[in-house]
């Protein structure tokens, strides 16, 4: 409660201080009963289905269709699709809880299940009712895949460097170009595609690109070989080439020329989910490390009794809990329709770094066994690295964070956003 002096100095009435006190009592970090049930159901599926199958799919690299179908039947796939389009209609926070739980079992299998999320976001942001009913409705009805096609061989972090172009002819657009590292590309029923619609290289990004929904069976689309990646190996990643691909004008997402804003806006919705994936991996690292430390003996006692190991476990726990807080906050920002670029970037950046440090510590705690594929932490370390790369590298997140805080400080005299 504010003191009488503080109340007077700030110009707050007694009624206002009462409201402030009431609001402070309403702040809670507890999940609702429904959210706890969602989390428990996802974690049960993760431990019973994903954990036992993780190593097999990591070795084979096969896409986990049967597991994807099971997840869809349980409502764990694309849970953020609104009920009006046939989906579960879960919040961004509830979706993050599912991603975290599934990633505890295997981030590669999780990506197979939740990979369409990034393609869903721009449709949700900029799609008209007909587009949402058709494309979101299809994802809700069946366990199918959709892909986000923006990255190119020469345009990763620099989205303004996209070379894929589109040309309007009558009631159609003709798309030509090549996209790289497309998650789910080998199985996608439709693609979100960003193409340059203004041939002037000096045109501002906000007016130079147009976004499309492109059906996967459109003539002129070719799918490259499945990439052999360091981690998350069952995730299907490919190059997608568009050669004179004709797309009806009705498949433009948002206004012509406004594609860059649509593509970037999707990240505010999806980065909390990516952060949640990193959380799940870090959580698994901590559990595996604690279990091993209580069993493995060295110098006549369990290694958990050695301070060097205790400190690594403590560091993992500290960062995991902090990453979880900012991830949940960034997800809640989306649900509350608060502009979330700042917190979403912090969550994605910190959770990604947390996952990588947790994996490094886990391997260290396991010692020589941690370097061997017979133990789970070797795979966790390989899977962790991509979180510092995809959906915006950790360096790009830091650029976003610094620009926003400096701009806010210049305008408001404080870095607190």
Swiss-Prot record:
Q: Which GO terms describe its cellular component?
A: cytoplasm; mitochondrial matrix; mitochondrion
Matching entries from Pfam families are given as:
Acyl-CoA_dh_1, Acyl-CoA_dh_M, Acyl-CoA_dh_N
Q: Quick one: where is this thing mainly located?
A: mitochondrion
The GO biological-process annotations, alphabetized, read as: medium-chain fatty acid catabolic process
- Pathway participation: Lipid metabolism; mitochondrial fatty acid beta-oxidation
Q: Where in the cell is it found?
A: Mitochondrion matrix
Q: Which residues form the active site?
A: 391
Which residues are noted in the entry as FAD-binding?
A: 148-157, 181-183, 296-298, 306-307, 364-368, 393-395
Which cofactors go with this protein? FAD
Say if the entry is tagged with keyword Manganese: no
Q: Where is the transit peptide?
A: 1-13
| InterPro entries noted in UniProt | Acyl-CoA_DH_CS (IPR006089), Acyl-CoA_Oxase/DH_mid-dom (IPR006091), Acyl-CoA_Oxase/DH_mid-dom_sf (IPR046373), AcylCo_DH-like_C (IPR036250), AcylCo_DH/oxidase_C (IPR009075), AcylCoA_DH/ox_N (IPR013786), AcylCoA_DH/ox_N_sf (IPR037069), AcylCoA_DH/oxidase_NM_dom_sf (IPR009100)
Task: List residues binding substrate.
Answer: 157, 268-271, 392, 403
Annotated keywords: FAD, Fatty acid metabolism, Flavoprotein, Lipid metabolism, Mitochondrion, Oxidoreductase, Transit peptide
| Catalytic activity from the UniProt record | a medium-chain 2,3-saturated fatty acyl-CoA + oxidized [electron-transfer flavoprotein] + H(+) = a medium-chain (2E)-enoyl-CoA + reduced [electron-transfer flavoprotein]
Q: What is its EC number?
A: 1.3.8.7
Q: What class of enzyme is it?
A: oxidoreductase
* GO MF terms held by the record: flavin adenine dinucleotide binding; medium-chain fatty acyl-CoA dehydrogenase activity
Please report which protein family the annotation says this sequence is part of: Belongs to the acyl-CoA dehydrogenase family.
How the protein assembles, per its UniProt entry? Homotetramer.
Task performed by this protein = This enzyme is specific for acyl chain lengths of 4 to 16.
Q: What is this protein called?
A: Probable medium-chain specific acyl-CoA dehydrogenase 1, mitochondrial
Origin organism is: Caenorhabditis briggsae
Q: Which gene encodes it?
A: acdh-10
């Amino acid at each position: 409660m504010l003191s009488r002096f503080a109340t007077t100095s700030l110009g707050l009435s007694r009624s206002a201080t009462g409201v402030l006190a009431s609001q402070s009592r309403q702040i809670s970090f507890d999940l609702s009963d429904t959210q706890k049930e969602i989390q428990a159901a996802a974690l049960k599926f993760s431990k019973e289905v994903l954990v036992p199958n993780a190593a097999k799919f990591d070795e084979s690299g096969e896409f986990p269709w049967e597991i994807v179908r099971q997840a869809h039947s349980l409502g764990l796939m694309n849970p953020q699709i609104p009920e009006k389009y046939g989906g579960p209609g879960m919040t961004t926070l509830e979706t993050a809880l599912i991603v975290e739980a599934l990633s505890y079992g295997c981030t590669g299998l999780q990506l197979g299940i939740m990979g369409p999320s990034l393609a869903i976001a721009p449709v949700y942001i900029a799609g008209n009712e007909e587009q949402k009913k058709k494309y979101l409705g299809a994802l809700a009805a069946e366990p199918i895949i959709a892909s986000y096609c923006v990255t190119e061989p020469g345009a990763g972090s620099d989205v303004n460097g996209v070379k894929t172009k589109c040309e309007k002819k009558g009631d159609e657009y003709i798309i030509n170009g090549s996209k790289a590292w497309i998650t789910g590309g080998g199985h996608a029923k439709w693609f979100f595609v960003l193409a340059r619609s203004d041939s002037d290289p000096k045109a501002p990004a906000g007016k130079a690109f147009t976004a499309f929904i492109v059906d996967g069976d459109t003539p002129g689309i070719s799918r490259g070989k499945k990439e052999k990646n360091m981690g998350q190996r069952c995730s299907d990643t490919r190059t997608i080439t568009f050669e004179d691909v004709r797309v009806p004008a009705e498949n433009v997402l948002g206004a012509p020329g406004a594609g860059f804003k649509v593509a970037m806006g999707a990240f505010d919705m999806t980065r909390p989910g990516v952060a949640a994936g990193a959380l799940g991996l870090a959580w698994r690292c901590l559990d595996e490390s604690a279990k091993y430390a209580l069993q493995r003996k060295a110098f006549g006692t369990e290694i958990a009794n050695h301070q060097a190991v205790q400190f690594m476990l403590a560091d993992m726990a500290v960062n995991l809990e902090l990453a979880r807080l900012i991830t949940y906050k960034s997800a809640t920002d989306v649900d509350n329709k608060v502009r979330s670029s700042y917190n979403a970037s912090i969550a994605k950046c910190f959770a990604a770094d947390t996952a990588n440090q947790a994996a490094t510590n886990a391997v260290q705690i396991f010692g020589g066994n941690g370097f061997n594929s017979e133990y789970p932490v070797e795979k966790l370390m390989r899977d962790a690295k991509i979180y510092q790369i995809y959906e915006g590298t950790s360096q790009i997140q830091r650029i976003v964070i610094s620009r926003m805080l400096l701009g806010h400080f210049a305008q408001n005299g404080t870095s607190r956003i």
